[in-house]
Amino acid sequence: MSGTKYVDSEGFLYAAPVREQGNIYKPNNKMMADELSEKAVHDVDTKEIDLVNRDPKHLNDDVVKIDFEDVIAEPEGTHSFDGIWKASFTTFTVTKYWFYRLLSAIFGIPMALIWGIYFAILSFLHIWAVVPCIRSYLIEIQCISRVYSICIHTFCDPLFEAMGKVFSSIRATVRKEI
């Protein structure tokens, strides 16, 4: 049984002592349990969802946050009856609220399924196709880049160095005539 390696006070490495009882993942041995100081492991795929704050990253703050005042407004001097204004506010708000709930009840799960499949395919292609292709390309282009670099250093560097020396002796003077 291979265990964790420990270092004693003199710096010698030794294997962890074998326990008489207890699970290897959750030891009953108090000394080892204190040393391991177990931490809760969180799986990102099985995390709890927040039913209160359903947009923690604020994805839809500027897009779908539309209230009655954002759509319908009466300027000064053109007001309808107060009862009509209150009834239209209530109608707008309740209709928007319940129609959204109806649409999400009908199409929410199928759309979640479609988007889940889409992002799974996208992740799969990125992991198993795009990144390997890019890595392969970089490996293959490395050979070409070395040949290109040698050609540049062999032919272009001396040419441009010579041109620089030729043009470095040119002096320009600016004179202002009135």
From Swiss-Prot:
PROSITE patterns: CAVEOLIN. One of its GO terms (biological process) is negative regulation of endothelial cell proliferation. Belongs to the caveolin family. This is Caveolin-1. Residues 105-125 dip into the membrane without crossing it. It is found in: Golgi apparatus membrane; Cell membrane; Membrane, Caveola; Membrane raft. It comes from Gallus gallus (Chicken). The keyword Phosphoprotein applies.
